[in-house]
Amino acid sequence: MLYNINDLKVGSDQDIILLIKCVEQGESQNGAYQRLMARDKQNHEIAIMNFTDISVKFKEPTVAKLRLSTQEYKGRISYQLINYVPVEGAVISDYLPKSKVNQADSWNYLVNTSKNLRPCLHKLVGMVLSANSTEFKVKALGPYKAFSRRNGILEATVKLTKLADFTSQILGLDRDLMLAGAMMYYVGYIDCMDDAFNITADDILIGAGTNTANRIKTQVQKILSGNDEQLKMSVDMTDVKLLCHMVMSRYKGIQPATAEAYALRYLDAMVTEVDSVETALSGYEPGSIITPLYGYGKLVKR
């Protein structure tokens, strides 16, 4: 039994246990087929073609024992499914990219930072993050490139918040608004990723910015419809509108209209682009010159 994709030998049929991240349906001149995206515990990923009469129907994502035919086709290795059996009791998270941060420390940093915000912003940040804390702490920011690993949303949020803190002081911006916006900037991504870190329809149809703004509005409505009159009076609708604008005025979003929104937009680009490059270079030796990768042109591993 194999567990590492790199151990598969060309020209033979072998058994291997992998995580099936997603199953795509397709149609060719020869009939219907399936394309399975699979990964092992060593962060290797492959596409497996299923041209058999056996339709892969299990609920994805799923860990399974796969019988594969491995052949060379047009200078590349081709993986074709022969059959499969789901593995009972397997832990999906064991197959996903590992975290680079301490989850508890990162979460505590956000909690402690939010305590110093003005009352309305403090309450909103606490309500939005607490309402989605489990997924917010665990999920990746995306399926590949920047922070495509466990705790990715949390890790990116902490880095963006720290940058927002220094930037607001250097540029004389509204520090509380900047910090609140930074702490909620990525929360909408929890709707854009599934448990195996695949993108969902929300990522394409709605987007993270709109998802985040909707979550802010939901918590505001809870406050306004509640019985705590003092809390209701603390709600500053101007701050709420500015927050919603900030989280939506990102790349792939609306045009920024405030200094704080512009600052967060470029800080977001800094945080995500730097991590994307670091991720792209992670598998290379120091001094390597890498041909155009991930749209960044040629890169050099320092």
Predicted regions and their residues:
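OB-fold nucleic-acid-binding modules
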Residues: 1-14
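Short nucleic-acid-contacting surface segments enriched for D/E, G, S/T with interspersed K/R
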Residues: 14, 51-67
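Structural detector for short beta-strands of small beta-barrel domains
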Residues: 11-27
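Divalent-cation-assisted or electrostatically stabilized phosphate/pyrophosphate-binding catalytic cores
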Residues: 149, 197-217, 256, 261, ...
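Histidine/acidic-rich helix-loop-helix segments that form or flank divalent-metal centers
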Residues: 179, 196-201, 221-286
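Acidic/His-rich, divalent-metal-binding segments that scaffold phosphate/diphosphate chemistry
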Residues: 90-203
